[in-house]
Amino acid sequence: MPLTVNCPICKAPVEWVPQSAFKPFCSERCKLIDLGDWASEKHVIPVKAEFDPEAFDEFDLDEGDFFKE
Protein backbone atom coordinates (compact mmCIF):
# COMPACT_ATOMS: atom_id res chain seq x y z
CA MET A 1 0.00 0.00 0.00
CA PRO A 2 1.53 3.36 -1.02
CA LEU A 3 2.20 6.16 1.42
CA THR A 4 -0.61 8.72 1.59
CA VAL A 5 0.03 12.35 2.55
CA ASN A 6 -2.29 15.31 2.83
CA CYS A 7 -2.09 18.13 0.31
CA PRO A 8 -0.49 21.11 2.10
CA ILE A 9 -3.12 23.48 0.64
CA CYS A 10 -6.51 21.73 0.74
CA LYS A 11 -5.63 18.70 2.91
CA ALA A 12 -6.95 16.20 0.34
CA PRO A 13 -5.23 12.79 0.48
CA VAL A 14 -2.45 12.28 -2.08
CA GLU A 15 -0.84 8.91 -2.82
CA TRP A 16 2.97 9.17 -2.91
CA VAL A 17 3.52 7.24 -6.14
CA PRO A 18 5.33 8.12 -9.40
CA GLN A 19 1.96 8.62 -11.14
CA SER A 20 1.07 11.51 -8.79
CA ALA A 21 2.22 14.34 -11.03
CA PHE A 22 1.77 17.16 -8.52
CA LYS A 23 2.92 15.54 -5.26
CA PRO A 24 2.86 16.66 -2.49
CA PHE A 25 -0.07 18.63 -3.92
CA CYS A 26 -3.29 17.04 -5.13
CA SER A 27 -3.59 19.18 -8.26
CA GLU A 28 -1.97 21.85 -10.39
CA ARG A 29 -4.32 24.37 -8.75
CA CYS A 30 -2.94 23.67 -5.25
CA LYS A 31 0.61 23.69 -6.61
CA LEU A 32 0.06 27.15 -8.14
CA ILE A 33 -1.56 28.48 -4.97
CA ASP A 34 1.55 27.44 -3.04
CA LEU A 35 3.82 29.03 -5.66
CA GLY A 36 1.82 32.26 -5.36
CA ASP A 37 2.22 32.19 -1.57
CA TRP A 38 6.01 31.96 -1.97
CA ALA A 39 6.02 34.72 -4.62
CA SER A 40 4.00 37.06 -2.40
CA GLU A 41 6.27 36.20 0.56
CA LYS A 42 3.53 34.58 2.66
CA HIS A 43 6.11 31.80 3.05
CA VAL A 44 9.70 32.77 3.77
CA ILE A 45 12.89 31.04 4.83
CA PRO A 46 14.16 32.76 7.96
CA VAL A 47 17.60 34.31 7.71
CA LYS A 48 19.72 36.38 10.02
CA ALA A 49 18.95 39.89 8.78
CA GLU A 50 21.58 41.86 10.63
CA PHE A 51 25.22 42.23 9.61
CA ASP A 52 27.69 40.35 11.79
CA PRO A 53 31.05 42.17 11.93
CA GLU A 54 32.61 39.14 13.63
CA ALA A 55 32.23 37.26 10.34
CA PHE A 56 35.37 39.08 9.13
CA ASP A 57 37.39 37.71 12.06
CA GLU A 58 37.70 34.32 10.39
CA PHE A 59 39.64 36.00 7.54
CA ASP A 60 41.98 37.92 9.89
CA LEU A 61 41.23 41.20 8.10
CA ASP A 62 41.68 44.55 9.77
CA GLU A 63 38.66 46.71 8.98
CA GLY A 64 40.87 49.76 8.38
CA ASP A 65 42.83 47.93 5.68
CA PHE A 66 39.87 46.19 4.11
CA PHE A 67 39.42 48.53 1.11
CA LYS A 68 43.06 49.49 0.62
CA GLU A 69 44.90 48.14 -2.38
From Swiss-Prot:
InterPro entries recorded: DNA_gyrase_inhibitor_YacG (IPR005584), Znf_NHR/GATA (IPR013088)
Chain residues that bind Zn(2+): 7, 10, 26, 30
Manner of cofactor binding, per the entry note: Binds 1 zinc ion.
GO molecular function: DNA topoisomerase type II (double strand cut, ATP-hydrolyzing) inhibitor activity; zinc ion binding
Coiled-coil region: none
Keywords: Metal-binding, Zinc
GO biological process: regulation of DNA-templated transcription
Keyword Metal-binding set for record: yes
Cofactor: Zn(2+)
Record-linked Pfam families: YacG
Signal peptide region: none
HAMAP family: DNA_gyrase_inhibitor_YacG
Family: Belongs to the DNA gyrase inhibitor YacG family.
Function: Inhibits all the catalytic activities of DNA gyrase by preventing its interaction with DNA. Acts by binding directly to the C-terminal domain of GyrB, which probably disrupts DNA binding by the gyrase.
Oligomeric and partner information: Interacts with GyrB.
NCBIfam families noted in UniProt: PRK00418.1
Name of protein: DNA gyrase inhibitor YacG
Organism of derivation: Shewanella baltica (strain OS185)
Protein's gene: yacG
